[in-house]
């Protein structure tokens, strides 16, 4: 399946399914990582060399974690949103995140995975700067 002639490939089941060996035969133009860690570092390097856009797992499959956070916030406030509000808030956050990663990748001429990691590290560093070391 990984080697089918498709526009978008979504590895969404297993970690390490896109390896150095399997990446060589991938013909998709875009890979959206639905699974956690579906691409090995060797596979990632080959995909980058082939100029295949990879939307990394930490961006592509973060919707579930975001909605879990929404549930926590609603429970804490005892104020519950409609399904449409949840979808709109999720869409807003996901689109903002996609734009940030795309901008960083383009601006720095790096992969989307590197951009997503850079943004994540910067956010943690800023939180640490503002709040101090959290136990």
Description of each model-found segment:
Residues 1-22:
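A structured beta-alpha segment of the ubiquitous adenosine-cofactor-binding alpha/beta core
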Residues 12, 24-135:
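Adenosine-phosphate binding glycine-rich loop
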